[in-house]
């Protein structure tokens, strides 16, 4: 029997899951975490960054968007003793936010993968694995210019 975790976001009432990624400054994937949509970004961001910090102890700071304010910022600054830079959207019009753009670009590269374009996976572990495989495929294509 297959169990599918379903949850709705508070704002958009969308069923599915969220992906949190940690990238380096060039947009290369360091860590990925997938969870149901009913968990807030600032709470799950703490778990994601702590896991990334254990894998990569040289991490000194993090740039995050406005959804990670509050709990995440306090936890990373106090408990993990890392720098946090929250990049907020500007109220007037559309503009490129350089630090945030790195992660958005990585997500768009990953969404080019057919398997990630929709939420086909049942478990969050297999969803995370598909993200990693898609990134490996992307890196190999760039390495060999295919």
Model-predicted regions and their roles:
Residues 1-83, 88, 134:
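Polybasic low-complexity intrinsically disordered regions
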Residues 20, 70, 74, 80, ...:
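Basic, amphipathic alpha-helical segments enriched in Lys/Arg and hydrophobic/aromatic residues
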